[in-house]
Amino acid sequence: MNQTIKFLLFVVTLGTLTACDETGDQIVAEEMTIPKGYALSAGTSTVFFNSAVAYDQPAKWVSGVYDTRFTRGDQLYDNVKTINNNGHMGGLGPVYAGYSCGSCHRNAGRTEPTLWTQGGSGTYGFTSALIYVTRKNGAFFPDYGRVIHDNAIYGVQPEGKLRVTWDFQKFQFPDGEAYELAKPNFEIYEWYADSIAPEDLFCTVRIPLRHVGMGQIMAIDRHEIEQLAARSNYPEYGISGKANYIVERGVRQLGLSGNKAQHADLTVELGFSSDMGMTNSRYPEEISEGQLQINQGSMMGLLYDQLDVSTEDMENVDLYMQSLGVPARRNVNDAHVIRGEQMFYQAKCHLCHVTTLHTQPRGSTLLAGTELPWLGGQVIHPYSDFLLHDMGSEIMGVGLNDNYVSGLARGNEWRTTPLWGVGLQQKVNGHTYFLHDGRARNFVEAIMWHGGEGEASKNLFKNMSKTDRDDLIAFLKSL
């Protein structure tokens, strides 16, 4: 399908949303009340919610057939998949990491992982995390692939289970306030095939990303990101960001999504395949092809003669994700928040967590060709440059180096995490676990794990007064 919608350029003025056609002639004008004390995060896709569903609301422009498709995509995202091959919610397994998109991304956020609460693979093996494994030479294990699936349908053996233990180390700020960092140690056990010797194994765990601003990220002006990479060099602070480039659908593209900017799209098709074991037109083979779980699945009645999810359904999920609104900032008139924003700049956090970017004029295109021009021409505030930065390898022995290479990203290089919506994570998902594997239990720990190119900002934060540090955290909570 290749549906093209008439292009509208949205211009946000004080209190008014005006739509113009390509000639600049005004064709629509409607009032959009901006509550006092709020700040727009994503232009016309900003929503004004401060609740457990703040990440899970459609943008204002979603209407008509797109509202219907949004609802359909929302259902496919949230509803529990089954093993039935009946063309509706079926096709799960035989091995999987999550039983729906929403199982790991509750309310389009980050489901609380079991790494802290249950020490690894939790009840029925569910961790709300992805377990990546490679040989130490970078090769994949033929019996497992890139991800260990710790869930399986009834009667089928999972590929393995995850156990995590923690090393704790106490520190102090110069003013005497204590803080603690926790380093995870990951272990795979109950391998379905031959156990892999620890000395030949790299294991990294990724907890879910917030699905905030996905449409804006897909519509972002790629040239602006490349320009940032060209001039993102601040030797006085040890900062030099670079873009990641990857090959998807046979085309070399700028990476934007994922922990290491290792994807050019929202990986809907890959998520159905790798995370849920559901075959589709892009990934028609079972994720456990060649493994014993295929035969076990057949014995349990699983069929392999049809695709488990249609391209139309996957595009509706893509539409849902790209049409979600971005929560407006809160408490922007609070004195502590205002002071905290000053501290954010004083600590040079903005050099990587870039405050303002723009989307390309014509918006984004969904996986099957539907265009979303409403996302075009917007001023957005994601607090990210979407570039790779070396985050260090020396804190507690390993820092944030996970030894996992993705495209041009080395193990110690990570995409700058967008911060929009981060202050609502506790309200939406009930926890404040941050960083790629959830090792940081709060904002302070997340900052203090910064090494490498983040070392200067960490030290500037570290040497602030407690009042200034608290105000910087108050600013982060307003995002």
Please state what every model-predicted region is:
Residues 1-8:
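Bacterial N-terminal signal peptides that target proteins for export
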Residues 16-42, 49, 55:
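Bacterial Sec-dependent N-terminal signal peptides
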Residues 67, 107-110, 151-188, 307-329, ...:
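C-terminal capping alpha-helices of c-type cytochrome domains
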Residues 53-92, 316-345, 359, 364, ...:
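Electrostatic cytochrome c docking/interface patches
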Residues 45-69, 79-314:
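Extracytoplasmic redox metalloprotein regions
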Residues 8-16:
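Bacterial N-terminal signal peptides
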Residues 96-108, 211, 317, 340, ...:
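The canonical Cys-X-X-Cys-His
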